[in-house]
Amino acid sequence: MTDVPPEIIEHYTEEVDEGERIAAGFSQLELLRVQEVVRRHLPAGSLRVLDVGGGTGIHAQWLAADGHSVHVVDPVPRHVQQAPNLGGVTSELGDARQLSANDDSVDVVLLFGPLYHLSEGEDRVRALREAMRVVRPDGLVFVAAVSKFASLFDGLARGLLFEPGFPEIVERDLREGEHRNPDRLPHRFTTAHFHHPDALRAEISAAGLDVVDLVGVEGLAGWLPHLADRWDDPEARQLILYSARAVEAEPSLLGLSAHLLAVARRRPASGTAPPASAARTPTSRR
């Protein structure tokens, strides 16, 4: 099953290089914040990680460097060809809704992409249930989503709101959570579903997973003008990170972030106690 809309495949094949995007410029904030949230929750030791929708392996790379065994599953052939070039990473062509992995076969699943490229709610819940199937009891599932308010804030921050056709995109995002790019302009992203924070939590719960944490990744800092330039200044970078961390769990401000990151856990097998690693208190957000 790889019936992904062709415009999504074309976007990641012909219009953008996802690895370069997230490793450069203002996306450095997104990358570093995802790293620290994931590392905060991971138990000690070498883990088996399934990176579903892992793209070119941008997250698989640092996880492998941390000593974990990482396998990328992605529906874009270009990504599957690129990911194995990273040390310690394997890959396969596949779909989040029908994974080839065996039941209970991994310690951690990343869903960084599938939920915002599956427009139907049933498909998103199906992907979450597949993640729950392949992760071991008490294992973790990390779920990324795009905030339904992202286009509005991006439009204001970068002046896109004043481009012909962009206000209509924003209106649909806010009304339905369905993002479309009829003019196929690369800077307007591609076909996607954008989440309200409450809806993301509800979908994860509907799949049978327990939500452990839900954070805003970038906060208002993600919309800072000239963020890429300020990021090069070490002192400014720490202030930017502080501003994101300070409000990451504030419910009234979650939607201000471009990206949401949920941490979910598969319930332990009936009659068994969680392992000691699962009972660890996550390190401080500060």
Report residues per predicted region.
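A short SAM/SAH-binding and catalytic strip from SAM-dependent methyltransferases
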Residues: 107-122
